Regions:
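A short helix-loop-beta submotif of the ANL/AMP-binding
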Residues: 1-8, 12-16, 25-30, 128-129, ...
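Flexible, low-complexity linker/hinge segments
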Residues: 65-88, 115
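Conserved AMP-binding
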Residues: 11-12, 134-139
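Conserved AMP-binding/adenylation subdomain of ANL enzymes
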Residues: 112-129, 139-179, 192-193
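Conserved S/T- and glycine-rich ATP-binding loop of Class I adenylate-forming
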Residues: 88, 93-97, 130, 172, ...
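Structural core segment of the AMP-binding/adenylate-forming
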Residues: 5-68
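Adenylate-forming
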Residues: 33-43, 163-164, 177-213
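Conserved AMP-binding A3 loop
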Residues: 89-116
Length: 213
C-alpha cells in the first residue's frame, strides 16, 4: 500500500480460465503464488500465465519471500510517497456468476471505514483472539472485520492453513479463540465433528455466519 502497489486478490478456487481473464484485465507486473496447495501446482499455472501475458515480469513463490534479496531489483526513481484516502487500495473480484470475475476498485477510505466499524460492531479489542478460517481474498474474511479489522482492533489473529473443521476446532482450543467467521456448511461440519473430538471451546464468544438464509 505504501508504495502504491494495488493488490488483486484471487481466490484459491480460481482456475486457469478465471486467472487468465483476471490477468488480461488487471495487467499485473508481479504474481505472488503458493507453490502447491491441495495437490494443485499453482507455480506451474503461474508460469503458463507469465508466458501468455508479457505484463507479468516476475513470478514470486510465497514460500521463498523471506529468503529473497530485493535489494538488486530495479525500482522506479520516484516512489509513491503517500497514498491518498481516495486512491484505490485494492482490486477485489466479483463473484463471477456471469463468467470471468470483474475487478472492483476499493479506495483506502472505504476499507479503513469497513475494518474499523465492523471491528467495533463485533466488540473486538486487544483482548480478542480472532480466527480467520477461510480465504482472506474474500472481502468478508479480509475486512468484515476479518483479517484487517482484527489487526486494526489490536486482536491476536490466527490464520488457518486449510480451513478444515478439525483444524478450526484445534485452533480454537490451542489459541483460546474468542471470535471467528464461518459459512453455514463449515459451521455444520465443525458442530458434527466436535461431537467426536470434544475440543475445549469455552473461550469462544462470537461466531459470525455469512451467507446464511
Amino acid at each position: 500500500f505504501k508504495i502504491g502497489v494495488i493488490p488483486v486478490l484471487a481466490m484459491p478456487s480460481h482456475g486457469m480460465r478465471e486467472l487468465s481473464g483476471i490477468v488480461k484485465t488487471a495487467q499485473p507486473k508481479g504474481f505472488i503464488v503458493i507453490e502447491t496447495y491441495h495437490g494443485v501446482d499453482h507455480l506451474a499455472e503461474a508460469a503458463v500465465l507469465q508466458k501468455e501475458n508479457p505484463c507479468i515480469e516476475k513470478v514470486i513463490p510465497a514460500e521463498r519471500l523471506e529468503q529473497m534479496d530485493f535489494s538488486q531489483w530495479e525500482l522506479d526513481e520516484e516512489l509513491y510517497e503517500k497514498p491518498c484516502s481516495r486512491d484505490t487500495a485494492i482490486l477485489v473480484l466479483s463473484g463471477g456468476s456471469t463468467g470471468i470475475p470483474k475487478l472492483i476498485a476499493r479506495p483506502h477510505a472505504d476499507y479503513l471505514h469497513l475494518q474499523k466499524y465492523c471491528a467495533l460492531s463485533c466488540g473486538m479489542d486487544e483482548n480478542s483472539v480472532s480466527l480467520i478460517a477461510m480465504p482472506v481474498t474474500h472481502c468478508w474474511n479480509l475486512c468484515g472485520p476479518g483479517l484487517l479489522g482484527s489487526l486494526f482492533a489490536g486482536a491476536k489473529t490466527v490464520l488457518c492453513r486449510n480451513g478444515s473443521a478439525d483444524e478450526i476446532l484445534n485452533c480454537i482450543e490451542m489459541h483460546e479463540v474468542t471470535t471467528m467467521a464461518l459459512v453455514p456448511s463449515l459451521l455444520r461440519a465443525c458442530i458434527s465433528l466436535q461431537d467426536l473430538m470434544e475440543n475445549d471451546l469455552s473461550s469462544l464468544q462470537m461466531i459470525q455466519i455469512g451467507g446464511a438464509r
